[in-house]
Amino acid sequence: MFNRIHITVNQLVASDLFLGYHIANWNPRTNFFLIGKYKNTNIFNLNYTYFLAKKFIVFLSELFVNKGHLWLVNENFSLFNRSSELYQLYSLFPEITFLNSKWCKGMLSNYKYVSIVKPAKFPHSIFVPNIQNNHYVINESFIINIPSIAIVDSIDNPSNVFFPIPGNSKSLKSLFFFYMVIAKSLFYSRYITSSKFIFNSINRLNGLNSKLYRNLFVRDYFAFFKKRFLLENIIFLFKSGFFSKKKFNFLFRPKMHITSKTLLFKWKMPLLILSSVFKNVLHWDIFNKIVLKKRLVVKNLQFFKTLMFVLI
């Protein structure tokens, strides 16, 4: 499967995924994922986390390429209040539904008969960042054979989870890391679908005698569709109204001076989202053209652009 999302063990360490619960609170079923203890705290073996996280990326990319639907379920209100800006990004994409309210029992197993307002699409997969607060979701998805993906901490029971990922489920950093992986895999799945015909056309290039010409042909088409993919997704963000929300009104106010204080304290999390999604792939000439078309005047645009890359 073609995938351009790369993660490293250093990113897992920076996200505090190696930390577990106190040694007094642990589940023997997670003993396989533990490497030891340090200061009465269980420590996860990041080799398993790294291997399963890469499989998680491939699974997500295949899910989105085949037009699947994903539910993000989180009942941990403490994490939701601290990271509420994260979830505004997922309201833009029809492939993802985020559920942050209290889980109604029978939402999956009795989907037809639940009388509350339900999401429009039934899920093909479910992502649960914390099993302790969402064990009803895991049990219902296990009953009706929907693949569930969950971050399994040292106190959790991974027996009913279809795709367990060992790690720290009580940290905001680990939650932010996995949500950024989901956002990146969604963007790259759109890139895969837009350039699918390239892989079909490679088999038709056997008539070319030289391998050099064949490689140049494929490389040029990849570059062309990479620019097209970026342009389509950036225009999608503008059309969907993501930049027209209150926290992004500074982009639409003419000749407004942007200071470091307003960016770092009011719009830090949305800038982190955009910078992580478009890092190393965003061409600022395309961004500037869209800004000029929308007649957006930002006085300190260079500071805004550098901050997007420096924050992560």
Swiss-Prot record:
The keyword Disulfide bond does not apply. It is found in: Mitochondrion. One of its GO terms (molecular function) is structural constituent of ribosome. GO terms for cellular component: mitochondrial small ribosomal subunit. The keyword Iron does not apply. One of its GO terms (biological process) is translation. Keywords: Mitochondrion, Ribonucleoprotein, Ribosomal protein. Belongs to the universal ribosomal protein uS2 family. This is Small ribosomal subunit protein uS2m. It comes from Acanthamoeba castellanii. The lineage of its organism: Eukaryota, Amoebozoa, Discosea, Longamoebia, Centramoebida.
